[in-house]
Structures are given as structure tokens and as C-alpha cells.
Amino acid sequence: MSRHPEVKWAETTEKIFLTVVLADTKDTKVNLDPEGVFDFSAKVGPENHVYELKLELADKVNVEESKINIGERSIFCIIEKAEPERWNKLLRVKKPPHYVKVDWDKWVDEDDEGSAGAADMDMAGMEGMGGMGGMGGMGGMGGMGGMGGMGGMEGMDFSKLMGGMGGMGGMGGLEGLGGMGGMGGMGGMGGMGGMEEFEDSDDEEETAKSGDKKDDAVKEEGLATEKAPAAEETTSVKEDK
């Protein structure tokens, strides 16, 4: 036997905000047709309890512009009205069932629709929402099966995803950090080893200069030795005279 989940709703002139309060759903199916008939079914829990809904909305809707988000705690729908006007009720029936309640947290009075708060509420939960149109052929909303596409993350090949990360070429450029291997170029600081060669060349130059000085000293010494006998010869000549 199926059960009925709690349903909350609010409206603006152009939209209906519909929340099916049901956590951790499986095999979730949603269908919305242009006449405003909303069908929902899902399984919950280890025993796969079945929850179902069939709501005949107060007026026609624009399925293609409507959106849905299947979350962990609830299923949130933004249903676009076919004609922009206040319905003042959710269903065609005079007395709604006990599980259908007004969502006062999202309710916006007609006079307040242009306010920033109303705009924020309109955008709430929009991130990650899929269109209800073309959702798998479930009457316009059948596309909601496409919401399985949301679950499609489960079927995503993460190796390809990571490969795509490689596509963040700049990140691949981190291989350039291998260029940090270029820090090995700091080994080029080994070229600073060239500083040692530079110092050696200085030493050699100084040694060479020192050797030159020694050679000069030896030459001067030789000259002095050569001049000495001449002096002696002069002395002996004088003595002979």
C-alpha cells in the first residue's frame, strides 16, 4: 500500500513553489503535464516503502519553463504558470488533503513580489536544478527522469573527469614545476663552482706575477755580477800606472 508524503506550496503571480518533503528517495519519478496534473512516486528506506502523489493543480502550467531539484531531504519544484495570475490555492478541489500545506517560509504577498527577499526566495535552490520539460518523455515533466541525469554523476567516469583536469592545462603546467627540477638549474649554481675556477685563475695570475718578479731579480743579480769584474779591471789598470 502506498503512502502520501507531505507537500508544501507557495506562489507568486508567475510561479508555484512546490516541495515534496521526503528524504533519501530512490526510483524517483515525477511527471507534470500542461493541464497541471502533477504525478510523483518514489521508494524510501531499506524496506522500499512506496510514496505516491497525484495532484491536479488549480490551472494550466508551462512545463518547459518549470524546474526541479531532487535533493537528499526533499524534492523542490518551481512550476511556471501558463498565465501570470494569483491562484490563491494549489488544487482544483475545494478542500485539499491533510498532507498538503502552505509553505509560509516561501510565501510572498502580492504587494511584496518586487522586493529583494522575494527575488532571493525565487532563486533559492535554483542551483543544480534541471528543467522539467523533456525529462524523458514523461509528459513534459517526464524529463524529470532526466533528473536521473543529476544522479548521472554516479555514472560519470571520473578517470575522464580527472583527465579533463589535465585539460586544466595550466595545472598540467604544474609539470613545469618539474621545472623546479630546473631548480636543478640551481645546480647551475654549480656554475658558481665556476667561482672556484675564477679564484684559481686569480691565484695562478698572482703566482705568475710572483715568478716574473723572481726572474727580474735573477736578471738584476746577473747584471750586477757582470759589472763587478769590470770594476776590478779598472782598479788593476790604475795600479799598473
UniProtKB/Swiss-Prot annotation:
It is found in: Cytoplasm; Nucleus. Pfam families: CS. Residues 196-206 have a biased composition (Acidic residues). Residues 225-234 have a biased composition (Low complexity). Residues 129-194 are annotated as: 17 X 3 AA repeats of M-G-G. Induction: Inhibited by heat shock treatment. Residues 188-241 are annotated as: Disordered. Gene3D superfamilies: 2.60.40.790. Keywords: Chaperone, Cytoplasm, Nucleus, Phosphoprotein, Repeat. Residues 2-91 form the CS domain. Disruption phenotype: Short root length. Impaired cell division in the root meristem. It comes from the Eukaryota. One of its GO terms (cellular component) is plasma membrane. One of its GO terms (biological process) is root meristem growth. GO terms for molecular function: Hsp90 protein binding; protein-folding chaperone binding. MGG repeats lie at residues 129-131, 132-134, 135-137, 138-140, 141-143, 144-146, 147-149, 150-152, 162-164, 165-167, 168-170, 171-173, 180-182, 183-185, 186-188, 189-191, 192-194. Residues 207-224 have a biased composition (Basic and acidic residues). Widely expressed but preferentially in the root meristem. Interacts with HSP90 in an ATP-dependent manner. Interacts with HSP90-5, HSP90-6 and HSP90-7. PANTHER family: CO-CHAPERONE PROTEIN P23-1, TELOMERASE-BINDING PROTEIN P23 HSP90 CO-CHAPERONE. Acts as a co-chaperone for HSP90. Controls root development through the modulation of auxin distribution in the root meristem. Belongs to the p23/wos2 family. This is Co-chaperone protein p23-1. It comes from Arabidopsis thaliana. The lineage of its organism: Eukaryota, Viridiplantae, Streptophyta, Embryophyta, Tracheophyta.
